Regions:
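Non-catalytic, topology-defining segments of multipass membrane proteins
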Residues: 1-270, 325-328, 332-347
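C-terminal transmembrane module of eukaryotic multi-pass membrane proteins
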Residues: 258, 263-347
Length: 347
């Protein structure tokens, strides 16, 4: 059992291994949200937003997305970016790659989401080991089976998630076509060592910085009593787009990418924007690409360590007006929306 404490919780492989070491539990999941706040007394996120411990844990998880990027880049390299697009036969070369890119993303990412959902919510052995680690057990019945109507309609979430993968695949094709047209990217990683290394190091920070502001703009800013409420862009975006994501108030794996297409376009711009502004090696692009596609999965799975879920973001879904960003970049502290589990605590 010492391995549970000594091994880093790298999702998903180490997480699965650590779950397998857990004894089967008979303890019922918590039935009240107050239990969540009580557990947060020992939460590693508490008081650590932006500090070394949280950053170390975050970067260990980032290694999963980097490995996915390396696997994809070296096994299925992108088309030759030195093609002469003046040649009519090459002008729409990316169209030949679009079906492959879409298939690769749907299979790779969809398999991760469906597999993790199965392990946590369908597999009886795993369920029996993790029940007491469920943040809010009100959507599980007495046998541990999921009750979709209580905050996690996983089939509906899966539909919108697949839509999101399609939209991100479209963005990926646009970036490749842009690279073919402008020759802005480069294929030799060490030909520009400084920008190559820095772009990899800052992917996580950029994604979390972008996520906070992209997320915050989709929540109301003015109160319902404010005279400015009719001019509130956040209220409009929440009502017409982001509210779909918040249908999952007791989240599961498929909740992460369950978004309205408008929100998908905003969320995945995190990958598109830097790719057309700065020279970027395809490996850095893929790293960012898989980060935005896969990180919502463990972040929404609804369970604490070692399953890999995020209590920080769970509190956002539970309370709506807190924790818009991530623990890695302390923007919630800066703008006054940080909650370590006590802000909405009830007696």
């Amino acid at each position: 059992m010492d391995l549970l404490n000594t091994l880093p919780n790298i999702w998903p492989l180490i997480s699965l291994f650590k779950i397998s070491l857990l004894p089967k539990e008979i303890k019922e999941p918590g039935s009240r949200l107050e239990n969540v706040h009580k557990k947060l007394e020992e939460n590693t996120t508490k008081g650590l937003q932006g500090k070394a411990t949280e950053l170390a844990a975050r970067h260990l998880r980032l290694s999963t997305y980097l490995l996915m990027a390396m696997f994809t880049y070296y096994l299925t390299p992108y088309p030759d970016i030195t093609l002469d697009l003046k040649d009519e036969s090459n002008r729409f070369y990316i169209l030949y790659w679009a079906p492959f890119i879409l298939s690769r993303n749907v299979i790779m990412v969809g398999s991760l989401y469906s597999g993790w959902h199965y392990f946590l919510y369908e597999n009886k052995t795993m369920r029996g080991k993790l029940r007491s680690r469920k943040f809010d057990g009100r959507n599980l019945d007495e046998n541990g089976d999921l009750i979709p109507a209580k905050g996690y309609h996983w089939k509906e979430c899966a539909f919108w998630s697949i839509n999101g993968i399609i939209i991100e695949s479209f963005y990926e094709c646009m970036v490749l076509q842009y690279w073919l047209t402008t020759k802005q990217t480069y294929t030799q990683f060490w030909s520009r060592p400084l920008i190559s290394v820095l772009s990899l190091l800052f992917v996580g920070y950029w994604r979390d910085f972008h996520f906070y502001f992209a997320h915050r703009v989709m929540h109301p800013y003015f109160s319902t009593k404010s005279k400015w409420r009719n001019f509130d862009l956040g209220r409009f975006l929440y009502r017409n787009a982001h509210s779909l994501h918040h249908r999952s108030y007791n989240t599961g794996p498929w909740s992460g990418l369950s978004m309205h297409p408008i929100e998908h376009l905003i969320y995945f711009s995190c990958v598109f924007i830097p790719s057309i502004i700065i020279p970027q090696h395809p490996l850095a692009f893929l790293y960012n690409h898989f980060h935005v596609l896969v990180s919502p999965l463990p972040g929404h799975d609804g369970f604490g360590d070692p399953a890999g879920g995020s209590k920080f973001h769970f509190l956002h879904h539970a309370h709506f007006d807190v924790n818009f960003g991530t623990p890695m970049v302390p923007l919630d502290r800066l703008f006054g929306s940080y909650d370590d589990g006590h802000r909405h605590k009830t007696d």
